[in-house]
Swiss-Prot record:
Descriptive protein name: Peptide chain release factor 1
Lineage top rank: taxon: Bacteria
Gene that specifies this protein: prfA
Bias-annotated ranges (Basic and acidic residues): 280-293
GO cellular component: cytoplasm
HAMAP family: Rel_fac_1
SMART domains tied to this protein: PCRF (SM00937)
């Protein structure tokens, strides 16, 4: 089907849905039609803008052919034609991006997990830096950042930490953060001034609701034990810590941050549900397009995606060859938008090559 025919078909569908909604339908039929109508609004607005520019260009070209035009009028028409010819490719691209298949998870809130990787205590300190960076970014975006669990080293580092980030389209903005983040800096304990390299792993999961993932009680094994602190000492005398295993997948979540077993269980179930949902989402994504696994958006957690070089004051994203020489703004202030927007644009460009 030609591009223009496809656009006409979408406009017809939008008009028919509008007529249907105004005809007095009720119940599930109304809900379904309303959802479809709302989903088409953005792309229809872009199609209309594109069609309007095409129509204006055709009119301008026809007017230019008329006999007896003075030089001033002719120059004005040629300027208009030049402007329209330059805007059409951009408008067409905007339409194609709006037509790209949507990831159902993009509109969801997210759970972020940061784990120290290679590099010992320095890696744990870097994991804490990353976790705080995402907290600052969430604050800048007006999202709600709720710490779910932190396993600290006792001297400021995090062995692992997780948080729930709630807001509009959180997952669509943060999903490209999944992967291995590397840091190069001189540790405070380094007397010779040598640069050390360490790493931390970030996983971003779409936060799943109960309607997304139904977990049967029979599929869970729940173990309780006494919470322990740094060095293994017990921090309370009740079995408040919880370990939940989803038997069909083998996915396990352990939590001991809260003094209440009930609260630990609720948080652990939230993380478990997100991990199961993400696993199912990844399988579907792989089935849809194996060829896209290697590109930005694959979220491969073994992939080294970004380096933070403190001596040089730079942050480099290796997937899109983008380097920013403002490490403090990025790390301390959470100013991640330049990376986020560039990664989204790169992902859209690669998807456009497939249609």
């Amino acid at each position: 089907m030609r591009f223009s025919d496809n656009l006409a078909k979408i406009l017809d569908k939008y008009e028919n849905l509008g007529n249907k909604l105004s005809s007095g339908i009720m119940g599930d039929e109304f809900v379904k039609a309303s959802k479809e109508y709302a989903e088409l609004e953005d792309v229809v607005a872009k199609i209309k803008e594109y069609n309007k520019a095409k129509s204006e260009l055709e009119e301008a070209n026809n007017f230019k052919l008329e006999v007896g035009l003075d030089n001033a009028t002719l120059e004005m028409i040629e300027d208009e034609i030049y402007t329209l010819e330059n805007s059409l490719p951009k408008l067409e691209r905007a339409v194609k991006i709006a037509l790209l298949p949507k990831d159902d998870a993009d509109s969801k809130s997210a759970i972020i997990e940061v784990r120290a990787g290679s590099g010992g205590e320095e890696a744990a300190l870097f994991a804490a830096v990353l976790f705080n960076m995402y907290q600052r970014y969430a604050e800048l975006k007006g999202w709600h950042f709720e710490i779910l669990a932190i396993s600290d080293t006792g001297i400021g580092g995090y062995k692992e930490a997780s948080a729930s980030i709630k807001g509009k389209d959180v997952f669509s903005k943060l999903k490209f953060e999944s992967g291995v983040h590397r840091v190069q800096r001189v540790p405070e304990t380094e007397s010779q001034g040598r640069i050390h390299t360490s790493a931390a792993t970030v996983a971003v999961l779409p936060e799943a609701e109960e309607v997304d993932i139904k977990i049967e009680d029979k599929d869970l094994r729940i173990d309780t034990y006494r919470a322990s602190g740094a060095g293994g000492q017990h921090v309370n005398t009740t079995d408040s810590a919880v370990r939940i295993t989803h038997i069909p997948t083998g996915i396990t979540v352990a939590l001991q941050d809260e003094k209440s077993q009930h609260k630990n269980k609720a948080k652990a179930l939230k993380i478990l549900r997100a991990r199961i949902y993400e696993e199912e989402r990844r399988k579907k994504e792989q089935e849809r397009a194996d060829s896209r696994r290697g590109q930005v958006g694959s979220g491969d957690r073994s992939e080294r995606i970004r380096t933070y070089n403190f001596p040089q004051g730079r942050v480099s994203d290796h997937r899109i060859n983008l380097t920013l020489y403002k490490i403090d703004e990025v790390v301390k202030n959470g100013q991640l938008d330049e990376f986020v927007e560039a990664l989204i644009a790169d992902d859209e460009a690669k998807k456009l090559l497939e249609i």
